[in-house]
């Protein structure tokens, strides 16, 4: 049921809650999954149209969560099919008590859980997009756990003995994407020149407060399959100028530089980063105009190819390198 709902447009639940299955469709699963068969009461068999090495890793993602068909049928019969998504029944250690859109999600420990009973009775997720506000809540004990602090706040957090700051390498990558359908970015020498002109180490210090590394691969260094032998682009303005001269652009040119309007773990301050890239490019004769839009509009316009250069990024979902390569570089991703 949970997979047929996403794959089959004729399933009565396909359009419930908007009918948007970004991950399922974006990962090409409608074409990959030929059939799902029941083997016995505790076993199902997936029939695929081709070998797919990361398939088991894909099934560990949120979109593959198993929903109760019995509950879905009951809600459809009652005329409230949306409750399947807004008041779901799962198999975890906590039971949903309350959901306030864009505000909070409240859970309580589920007495009938099949595994070890959780050590807390109540779990509340307070939806707080702004890292500064999250930090303020933590300081006031309005919350006890917060993720993704502002890099600028990390030093202060380390000095606060009441805070236990835990760190680990992120499973993400931030990047600047070039639109090769637009001149002069259709010339590889121009793209290389722009890359050589950017001082990534300075950006790591100023934007990430040192909590980052220069990316020379599409995948993070903590992920299996990472090739450390790949050579990074060094910061070399003179080489950038030479490449621009070879491309017939020694007098420079103008370009737009799209900066994300939101904070992300892979880019906590896109505006500051854009200003630094703008200054670096100016040193080799390239004049960049910083452009931004509301986040939804930003993504839509970028997908439509309106940009010349655009800041984007990706946070891994399942620990498999394919989740980076296929998601960002496959033919399906280009659409």
Report residues per predicted region.
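Surface-exposed binding/hinge segments that line
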Residues: 16-73
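Append "and occasionally in soluble cytosolic enzymes with long acidic Gly/Pro-rich linkers
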Residues: 106-111, 159, 186-279, 283
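Ligand-site clamp/hinge motif
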Residues: 1, 82-85, 110-156, 167, ...
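Alpha-to-beta junction loops
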Residues: 42-44, 139-148, 276-280, 284-287, ...
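Acidic-aromatic pocket-rim loops
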Residues: 12, 299-335
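Aromatic- and charge-enriched surface segment that lines or borders ligand/interaction sites
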Residues: 1-13, 39, 45-47, 134-137, ...
